[in-house]
Amino acid sequence: MKKPFFIIFFIFCSYYNAQANEWKIKNKWKISCGLVDKEALVINGKPKKSFNKNEFKVENVIFKLDSGEVGKCKSDKKPTGGYKYSGRQEITHRLPTGKTIFESTILTSGAPQYRSHFFQIHDGRWSGKPPSMVSVQKDWRVRNQHSNDCFKPKCKQLTYDIFLKPGEKKKFKAEIQYDQKEKSISAKYFLDNKFIIQHLDVPLAKKNADGPYGPNKPYIKIGIYRIGDTGTTTFSYDDIILKNKKE
């Protein structure tokens, strides 16, 4: 009688492990902080005209900010980086545990800015830099930023000759590992399949952190978060894929 039981148990365990190792699509986004205006956020071809905390699916999204527009997060009205305010329009997605891959084709257009973050892994900390960020500078050169808890060689940029210039579509990819037990994240970034940035074993904030998904719950942010604007700018994300598997 024991042999059939062990066979069934083995089959069940094999099936469970196979299911756990499969990639699963994640697609539950939310607006971050609020809407700047009725043209600032276009989801799947339809403008978001009112703000709420409901989740929605995203295949493509366009973020647009005009000159002088201030973001809706409380900190956006405060001076930072030598500028009087921050412009912001973003959406967020909870970061699952295990391995997560984000992919999208990004297209920028319009006026440059002093700096604009277009991808972040945040932990809801109230001050200081979040664990991982990718931005463009005033010449549209892609640069990395990260929390002050990570240093070279774990956190570094591998090449500086990379751009997101207006009118040039680029394939962006982030490979993320969220270790819930160690309370850390690792991320590797690629542009047109070129490995450009790594942030490894970056610790999450231990206190004073409360984001849209609860205390110390990391999440992804995409969109425009800029200072030093010089005019209207758009960031378009097409063919968005966010997938995860437990490990």
Predicted regions and their residues:
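Sec-dependent N-terminal signal peptides
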Residues: P4-C13
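Boundary at the C-terminal end of the N-terminal hydrophobic targeting segment
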Residues: A18-A20
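Ligand-recognition surfaces built from glycine- and aromatic
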Residues: W23-K28, P96-K99, A205-E247
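Extracellular glycan-recognition surfaces and repeat-rich motifs
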Residues: W29-V70
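Secretory/extracellular carbohydrate-interaction modules
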Residues: V58-N144
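Residues within well-ordered beta-strands of beta-sheet-rich folds
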Residues: K99-L107, K171-D179, S236, I241-K243
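Short, aromatic/His-centered strand-loop micro-motif at the edge of beta-sheets
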Residues: H146-K173
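Carbohydrate-binding surfaces in secreted/extracellular proteins
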Residues: K171-L204
